[in-house]
Amino acid sequence: VGSEMCIRDRCHTDHTPGFGSAAKYVASTMLEIAHDTYIYQIPSVVIVEIMGRDAGWLTAASCLARNDYSPAPHLIYLPEVDFDEDQFIEDIKNVLKTSRCVIVAVSEGIHDKDGNYISATSAVADKFGHAQLSGTGKALESLVKDRMDIKVRSIELNVLQRCAAHISSRTDINESFALGQAAVKYAAEGMTAVMSTIKRVSNDPYQWIIEPENVSLIANQAKTIPLEWITPEKNDVTPEMEAYLRPLIIGEVSLQYKDGLPMYLPVNHLL
């Protein structure tokens, strides 16, 4: 019996444990980057590289940072659709017509129409044969520097997206406990080769149930964002995408602190 462990892209489940908290971190960080960027009067472009080789769920979650006063990220690029460098530059120029700065969210796995990754470094395969990507943000930073006379920087969120326990989603924590408990229950009942999964009932109010699913249908399969949740211009997500994501980041977790820092479980056995 399995209990999920993945950032997001497992098939046959609405989402996986940890995704809501990672999405909350991405959106919060994007809002904080926006605040820092707005301080300066110099026109600028900020490119934020977010995890996502084949699926752009975490990058899409950056849309949750938008509020009444901040439209950032102004542009969102996902690996589910082809990326065009010329159109990227035009998109930036269009935003600059009405905004002093442009904040871009980009998945590490974006690629051109021929399937080539937009990455400043060669892709190295991990033990599963999946490309380990890095440098996408830097590649786009160089592109903007070459094509435009404007201040530009790139930011790679990297492992922070999956280890920022200080900003966990209460919804995510509750679901994670429930999934683990269900997995133990399935094992006690003699079930095998199954995994506990989340099935969404509704968005508003957000309701869900847990059901077992055959692991053979899930293993090594990636669940990508529906194309209808990506705008025709391929540079943003739709309101349906936001409505899907929003419930997953709701709620906060109270942490205990010691000497000014969060107290986490000791990991002596890993050292």
Stretch-by-stretch model annotation:
Residues 17-153:
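Accessory alpha-helical/coil subdomains and C-terminal extensions
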Residues 117-271:
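C-terminal non-catalytic interaction/assembly regions of soluble proteins
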Residues 8-15:
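Glycine-rich, charge-decorated loop segments at or immediately adjacent to ligand/cofactor-binding or catalytic sites
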Residues 8, 52-54, 81-83, 158-162, ...:
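Acidic, glycine-rich active-site loops and adjacent beta-strand->loop/helix elements
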Residues 1-7:
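Short, small-residue-biased leader/transition segments that mark boundaries at the very start
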